[in-house]
């Protein structure tokens, strides 16, 4: 399952495939390799209310995104070290997927650092759709209403909402941005299952998303 619902879809027109780039609803125009994952397994504007930055001891990848992408994580520290670590690594995993899209690399090392198994396979396919269509992402993303729980066995779950109302698809060849109207589908819920690996990193093993989720509506 992908990190967020596909912003990119393909429709057939006769024998020719016509690309329809959308971001959760209808909109107007403005002038994601088939390789298998091993084990299959700043310009960026940062958050106004972000959790602590990732711990450097695990040598987490440096994620630098272009200035046309911004993120707001409306989830504050919980006061619990494990829960805060889950939130922090989840922030980076979200940005890492967009970095792979920006880099046009479905096997980008940064996101593979945070995803494994089923989640990695689904995310690779999601990124490859953008790569195949020479498309990227632009705009502003907001994440809110986190619900995190940590088990003693080194596993955790995180549910949260995403506001995609100001996030768009961008064609790389023409630099055209597909601007879309904000609809109920612009609000997406996510449910992730994570595991703490040997490096102390909370990696995502499963992820389920629902666009238009009632619990995420403003």
Model-found features: residue ranges?
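Core segments of small alpha/beta cavity-forming domains
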Residues: 61-136
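N-terminal secretory signal peptides that target proteins for export/translocation
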Residues: 1-4
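Acidic, low-complexity proline/glycine-rich segments
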Residues: 40-70
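Short, low-complexity, disordered segments immediately C-terminal to signal peptides
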Residues: 7-8, 12-15, 24-52
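Structured, amphipathic secondary-structure segments that form assembly/contact surfaces
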Residues: 106-109, 113-218
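Intrinsically disordered, low-complexity, compositionally biased regions/tails
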Residues: 30-31, 43, 72, 143, ...
């Amino acid at each position: 399952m992908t990190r967020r619902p596909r912003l990119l879809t393909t429709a057939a027109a006769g024998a020719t495939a016509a690309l329809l780039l959308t971001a959760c609803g209808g909109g107007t125009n403005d002038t994601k390799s088939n390789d298998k994952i091993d084990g299959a397994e700043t310009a960026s504007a940062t958050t106004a209310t972000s959790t602590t930055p990732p711990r450097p001891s695990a040598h987490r990848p440096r994620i630098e995104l272009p200035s046309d992408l911004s993120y707001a994580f409306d989830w504050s520290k919980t006061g619990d070290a494990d829960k805060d670590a889950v939130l922090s690594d989840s922030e980076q995993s979200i940005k890492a997927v967009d970095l792979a899209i920006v880099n046009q690399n479905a096997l980008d090392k940064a996101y593979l650092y945070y995803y494994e198994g089923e989640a990695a396979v689904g995310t690779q396919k999601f990124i490859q759709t953008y790569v195949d269509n020479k498309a990227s992402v632009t705009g502003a993303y907001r994440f809110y209403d986190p619900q995190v729980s940590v088990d003693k066995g080194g596993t955790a779950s995180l549910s949260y909402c995403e506001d995609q109302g100001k996030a768009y698809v961008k064609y790389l060849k023409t630099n055209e941005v597909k601007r879309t109207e904000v609809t109920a589908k612009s609000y997406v819920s996510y449910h992730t299952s994570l595991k703490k690996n040997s490096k102390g990193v909370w990696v995502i093993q499963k992820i389920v998303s629902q666009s238009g989720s009632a619990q995420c509506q403003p």
